Amino acid sequence: MNKSQLYPDSPLTDQDFNQLDQTVIEAARRQLVGRRFIELYGPLGRGMQSVFNDIFMESHEAKMDFQGSFDTEVESSRRVNYTIPMLYKDFVLYWRDLEQSKALDIPIDFSVAANAARDVAFLEDQMIFHGSKEFDIPGLMNVKGRLTHLIGNWYESGNAFQDIVEARNKLLEMNHNGPYALVLSPELYSLLHRVHKDTNVLEIEHVRELITAGVFQSPVLKGKSGVIVNTGRNNLDLAISEDFETAYLGEEGMNHPFRVYETVVLRIKRPAAICTLIDPEE
């Protein structure tokens, strides 16, 4: 069903809705960081309100024998159920702007929708990295069972690369052999853009040779913090019921409120596939 049929009282045509949806999706893509290295599970459909998550520990190993006897150990150490929260931001299209667009035969300015999508995308990354206490959802930076690494002084050339190597080695010791993604706070990300000592190459170029799933920065990470993740849906994914939709909320005072929303939750299956970088002074 197209949007004009779904919302028959809306002032927008099918073409307008298509332009609105495209504007929202493009704005969200420019903002989102977590989705650049986390695989998606879904969309599951607008009726899905919860999803289970199997959490795996690192103690279970493969077996070798002649008969292949049944292993009584359960691979999944724990199963939890997450309520899938709605992330949303409302915006208003004013009736005078819509009438002007019709009278002059010009496109509708959907910049207000783009800004709403940007805010929802920021909230998604906030949930991915820091979780949600209200919904009991852990994030990459605070999930129990993750690895941690205390970083040195990145203002000295070479220290950043050395810390990333050591954090990666901790993941390797837990049999997480990549590919890895690295997300840094803006402060730490900027410090990678200096010449690596005894070379003519920026440190970030050497880091990218190790971190093959991408090196990113995110404004949701503050101070001197970061995280290295062994990517793959066996370690974590993003369960989605509805992905960046727009809805018409009904006329209000001659104007037309809309909503940008998504229903999404992070599922961390192997916490030991995550290593957070921590400033010892914080």
From Swiss-Prot:
Assigned keywords, A-Z: Encapsulin nanocompartment, Ion transport, Iron, Iron storage, Iron transport, Transport
Location of the protein in the cell: Encapsulin nanocompartment
Transport listed as a keyword: yes
Practical uses of the protein: The encapsulin and cargo pair can be overexpressed in E.coli and in human HEK293T cells. In HEK293T in the presence of 0.5 M ferrous ammonium sulfate nanocompartments can be detected and used as cell markers. Can also be targeted to cell membranes by addition of a farnesylation signal to its C-terminus. Coexpression of this nanocompartment with a smaller nanocompartment from M.xanthus (AC Q1D6H4) allows of expression of different sized iron-rich particles. The encapsulin shell proteins do not seem to mix.
Thermal dependence summary for this entry: The empty encapsulin nanocompartment is stable until 86.6 degrees Celsius, when loaded with cargo protein is stable until 88.9 degrees Celsius and when grown in high-iron conditions is stable until 91.8 degrees Celsius.
Keyword Iron on entry: yes
One GO CC term on file: encapsulin nanocompartment
UniProt site positions, description: 5-fold pore central residue: N200
Residues carrying the site annotation 3-fold pore central residue: D9, D71, E251, E252
Biological process annotations from GO: intracellular iron ion homeostasis; iron ion transport
NCBIfam families membership: encap_f1 (NF041155)
Description of how the protein assembles with itself and partners: Initially thought to form a 180 subunit shell. Forms hollow shells composed of 240 subunits, making a shell about 42-43 nm in diameter. The monomer is capable of assuming 4 different conformations which allows packaging into the icosahedron. The shell has 12 pentameric and 30 hexameric capsomers which form the vertices and faces of the icosahedral nanocompartment.
Protein family membership: Belongs to the encapsulin family. Family 1 subfamily.
Protein name, per record: Type 1 encapsulin shell protein
Species of origin: Bacillus thermotolerans (Quasibacillus thermotolerans)
Gene designation: enc
